[in-house]
Amino acid sequence: MTIDEVQKLIQGIFDNIFNSVTSAEPGGKPVMTAATTVLSLMKPGMAINSADFRNPWTPGNVNGSQDAAINTARLVDVAPKMSAIYTDSGNTISQVYKQILDGVCIPAQAPNPAIEKQLADADAVLYRTVDMIDPDTGESVPKRIETQLYRDYLDNQAAYNAARIGYIGAYLEAQKTTSGKNTWPLIATTLQLPVRQAYDRWRSGGADRVEQAMAIINTSSQNALQKAFDQAKKTFEGYGVALDDSGTGMSTPIQRSSLLPSNWHSTSSTGWTSFDSAASTVATSNTSDYKSYGGSAGFNLGLFSIGGSAGHTSQSQHASAETTNLRISFSYTLVTIRRPWLTFNLLGTKGWNLGNLFSRGKVSAGGKANQGSSVMPLLPTSFVVVKDVMISASWSKSDMDLIKSKTSGGGGFAIGPFSIGGTYASSRSKQTYSAAFTGGTIRVPGVQIIGVISQIVPLCPPA
């Protein structure tokens, strides 16, 4: 199998997933804008042990798993580099965001009581202050969190977007073959039903009221920046929890985050879209981000990854030229990341700087280009989760021997972005997993994250 054949197959997977969120059926609107959306494939993928993320602790679920809450918070806190290959920058989102909140410098603005009242009224629709017990002192302290109305709005919006992405993915897949195009009108109405139901649920839950408040905040914040940043800091602190307490009372709070749907880590989760490289012509684009932002270079080193773990490869190896007819099939879904502690719209406002901390555009250059030295160019908003991964080929003897040894002997092993064996991510017990290999076909158990979809952080700081 040639390098070009491998590249075409991996790019086909990349483009298929990217197009499902940035394209739309005729007359429809894409869920995300291609110019500000980035897909980063992992090499290798991150295998998920459901037990590590099930039933996370929350203030309303004090009997939940604190480890699951910690694992979730850390999973979504990585600040990746601007690349089509998932690369950890070494920074965390919560760390950089806190630095921005602590270091923001805003020129003095004349007070405007009318605007401040408008901002306060809108803010009350989205956030509320509740009393919580400080685990270190036992005292009741005020915490600023989302209102139930706003939380339901965001959850229902995420469910609608997931339904839309599933529908668009099915539509795009159907358009690849003549039979698919011919049968699409027969199944489209049925597939539209969950989309319409999700939309009605989202819009009927006070969406107009929430969006009016959001619009007021987005416009008024520019005229009351200091107040807006002060409120954002209170919200950030309100979601900090001492889950990983060392007993000294000095542990750094963990920013509580969540993933939707709540059973995302299970194969029984809903909203899956199928992909089969043999079912249709694998569509690739000459202008694909895969080629423009490092995907080709990342997988040019070889189809096989040996050793390493999620997103980190120790050694790459090319498939033998004698291996032919490689076929990859899987089902994928997008898992929405919720960080209620992060007020993203503030990063797009003007009229502030970070003094000597970060110069103009150092956090993010605001686009896909010129982000090489940026501290936090991307904000991950979704994980690409897959299940039912099957990989088959007419393997050469050397490749078959390699696969047999790795699926039976343990150790980190991957094909393309798919992890075939190794240690589960986030598992304190260091549990391992491995795929089955029979009759030339590899069957991978469970679910794994093979990519991250991010939004580009606006020019930050703006001055």
Regions found by a protein language model. Give the residues of each.
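Intrinsically disordered, low-complexity, charge-biased terminal/linker regions in eukaryotic proteins
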Residues: 1-204
